[in-house]
């Protein structure tokens, strides 16, 4: 991406008059606890999405100048006024949400709404970024972020902690220093990459806090810069926006590849639910990996963000199967879909190329419904009914070998769960305890899938 050019005499990039002034959109969005965000949409293809959190003084000329610059280069920008947001969070009645505040749902929802309004460009996981107090808030948000939700956390000269008296919903460690709450990060791998850059003007307590975070999470990247905060902020955001559209695999698809030494001569392909590759999809994939089944996970949120045709979906699946069967030297394929991902699997399987179709040893449909969609609906993600324009997966199963089909659902799932109807086409139906997410008993769910696979491989 071409970078914005600065005159050598400029002390700050914000000292120069912007060459492009973006107008805030007049469209309405559900913003949750974020009060009156400043939302800007680019013209043409979306190249990235940035949640730009202001410093302590609030949304002003410097933030608007940076937003203008990002929008001119193709980014969606959602500007957050730090003082008004903190005021809203401190006013929030936490008894409405189990005694704590969860900020990430508003960020995720707003990112999806705004990117959908921007057109049919690929979906970009948002970058959450800020300087000073904005950086401190970005780090606190990272303390409660699930996987595959935020694309990147980027902070410059962050302070230590945030002036919030209410609890954030997170198991991460917390300490109170004066009127500020200082959060650690949750155990395990980072939910998204974190970069913290420090200039000569950085707050020493803020740096000490990030260094403490890095002691527990070595993947955090700490950088030093002799530039001023605004300049290094802009330059780094350019690089991060460019990288946000790249996929780290030869097929150019939004995949999660979990390597394993195969012990069942089988690989798995998992289509995630509409929330993307996280939670149930990621956990089940990891458990299969530990059992010696290498996994390719397809992030349905990103893959189906723009509408796909059924044959296009099947052709991409054929490419995945062909490429990774050769790479892992396996004969069989375990084809799994969860929720939205389960709904598209039957028709996709039917349209596979003959060789790849013959390789499928089991089709595991988890929390199947009666409605197929080949595009993510923001309303569906918010819990509302989708149109099901792609038909009914039960009809798509007709003609498939019923001995391959395993449909698993939770006893307490919605009334419109489709698994019971799979009996009518001769497939195996398994009821497990729990709801749409199987009460998060993923050990039992994975065991059920593997037991079925082993039986089918023998038979």
What is the meaning of each model-derived region?
Residues 22-45, 223-263:
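N-terminal cap/lid segment of alpha/beta-hydrolase-fold proteins
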Residues 113-189, 323, 331-391:
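Primarily recognizes the serine-hydrolase "nucleophile elbow" in alpha/beta-hydrolase
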Residues 83-101, 274-276, 295, 299-312:
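Cap/lid segment of the alpha/beta-hydrolase catalytic domain
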Residues 84-85, 224-232, 301-304, 432-438:
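Histidine-bearing beta->alpha loop at or near hydrolase active sites
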Residues 95-120, 140, 307-328, 343-347:
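Alpha/beta-hydrolase active-site loop
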Residues 42-75, 79-82, 250-293, 297-301:
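Short, surface-exposed "cap/lid" segments of acyl-processing enzymes
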Residues 226-245, 310-313, 440-453:
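Post-His helix in hydrolase/transferase enzymes
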Residues 160-214, 259, 373-426, 430:
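The feature captures the conserved acid-bearing segment of alpha/beta-hydrolase catalytic domains
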């Amino acid at each position: 991406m071409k970078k914005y050019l600065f005159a050598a005499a400029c002390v700050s990039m914000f000292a120069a008059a912007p060459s492009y002034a973006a107008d805030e959109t007049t469209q309405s969005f559900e913003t949750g606890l974020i009060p009156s965000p400043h939302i800007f949409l680019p013209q043409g293809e979306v190249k990235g999405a940035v949640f730009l959190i202001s410093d302590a003084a609030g949304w002003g000329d410097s933030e608007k100048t940076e937003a203008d610059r990002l929008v001119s280069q193709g980014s969606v920008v959602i500007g957050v006024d730090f003082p008004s947001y903190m005021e809203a969070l401190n006013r929030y009645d936490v008894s409405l949400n189990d005694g704590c505040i969860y900020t990430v749902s508003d960020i995720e929802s707003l990112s999806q709404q705004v990117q959908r309004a921007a057109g049919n460009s690929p979906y970009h996981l948002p970058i959450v970024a800020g300087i000073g107090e904005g950086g401190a808030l970005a780090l606190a948000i990272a303390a409660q972020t699930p996987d595959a939700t935020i694309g990147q956390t980027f902070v410059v000269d962050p302070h230590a902690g945030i002036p919030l008296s209410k609890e954030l919903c997170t198991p991460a460690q917390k300490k109170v220093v004066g009127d500020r709450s200082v959060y650690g990060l949750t155990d395990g791998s980072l939910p998204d990459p974190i970069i913290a850059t420090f200039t000569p003007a950085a707050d020493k307590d803020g740096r000490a806090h990030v260094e403490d975070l890095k002691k527990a999470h070595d993947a955090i990247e700490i950088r030093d810069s002799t530039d001023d905060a605004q300049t290094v902020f802009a330059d780094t955001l350019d690089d991060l926006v460019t990288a946000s559209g790249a996929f780290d695999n030869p097929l150019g698809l939004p995949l999660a590849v979990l390597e394993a030494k195969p012990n069942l001569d089988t690989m798995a392909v998992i289509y995630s639910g509409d929330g993307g590759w996280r939670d149930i999809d990621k956990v089940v994939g990891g458990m299969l990996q530990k059992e010696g089944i290498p996994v390719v996970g397809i992030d349905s949120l990103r893959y189906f963000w723009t509408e796909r045709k059924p044959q296009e979906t099947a052709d991409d699946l054929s490419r995945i199967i062909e490429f990774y069967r050769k790479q892992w030297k396996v004969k069989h394929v375990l084809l799994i879909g969860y929720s939205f991902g389960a709904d598209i699997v039957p028709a996709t399987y039917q349209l596979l190329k003959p060789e790849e179709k013959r390789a499928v040893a089991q089709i595991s449909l988890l929390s199947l419904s009666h409605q197929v969609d080949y595009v993510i609906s923001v309303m569906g993600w918010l819990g509302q009914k989708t149109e099901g324009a792609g038909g009914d997966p039960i009809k798509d199963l007709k003609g498939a070998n019923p001995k391959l089909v395993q449909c698993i659902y939770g006893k307490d799932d919605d009334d419109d769960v489709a698994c019971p109807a799979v009996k009518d086409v001769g497939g195996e139906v398994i009821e497990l305890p729990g709801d749409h997410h199987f009460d998060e008993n993923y050990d039992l769910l994975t065991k059920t899938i593997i037991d079925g696979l082993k039986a089918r491989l023998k038979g």
